């Protein structure tokens, strides 16, 4: 669920305004408070824990900043992803990282994940377009309630995990459901099914 705040801001003003650990995004100058449910938090926590363990197991050069923003290159827009995976050595090249915990280069981000709440149109449309334009190589939409439009997840609607992977500058989409193992470029040996992620339980 989201709640808008009625004051237009530039991205720089937004950075000055927001407080540390606050859950806000900037959508074309509009400040939006991100409000989540308990189940949403369970799915995010489970998935981030599993990806962190996989990073350690495979000795991958990744970090998981919890409150970092991803800035759009062309608009007064900054997103606060549910899970953001960044390359450790790329952070020194990010001009806003030290001061504002903000990522501006898509090449710094091997994977970005959004867990769908009632604002599913943002995840499926606006954010997908922005992440593709930034050149982020992999984007997951975790729709554990099957809320997205039927054009995205089919009909009848059902829980679906969508993996967008960048090919020649455009996202190609794969859908995963039930006991299907999720295929990832950033985590090539990850052994998780869509069902495990939706339930937030590791049952092998």
How does the language model describe each region?
Residues 1-204:
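Gly/Pro/Ser/Thr-rich low-complexity, intrinsically disordered segments predominantly at protein N-termini
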């Amino acid at each position: 669920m989201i709640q808008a705040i009625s004051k237009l801001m530039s991205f720089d003003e937004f950075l000055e305004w927001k407080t540390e650990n606050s859950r806000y995004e900037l959508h074309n100058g509009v400040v939006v408070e991100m409000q989540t449910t308990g189940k949403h938090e369970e799915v995010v926590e489970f998935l981030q824990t599993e990806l962190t363990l996989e990073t350690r197991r495979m000795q991958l050069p990744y970090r998981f900043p919890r409150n970092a923003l991803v800035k759009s290159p062309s608009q007064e827009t900054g997103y606060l992803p549910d899970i953001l995976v960044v390359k450790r050595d790329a952070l020194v090249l990010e001009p806003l990282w030290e001061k504002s915990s903000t990522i501006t280069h898509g090449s710094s981000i091997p994977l970005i994940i959004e867990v769908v709440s009632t604002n599913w149109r943002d995840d499926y449309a606006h954010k997908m377009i922005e992440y593709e334009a930034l050149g982020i190589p992999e984007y997951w939409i975790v729709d554990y309630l099957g809320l997205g439009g039927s054009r995205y997840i089919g009909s009848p609607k059902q829980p679906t995990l969508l993996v967008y992977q960048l090919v020649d500058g455009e996202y190609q989409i794969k859908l995963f459901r039930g006991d299907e193992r999720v295929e990832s470029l950033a985590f090539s040996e990850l052994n998780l099914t869509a069902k495990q992620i939706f339930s937030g339980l590791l049952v092998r």
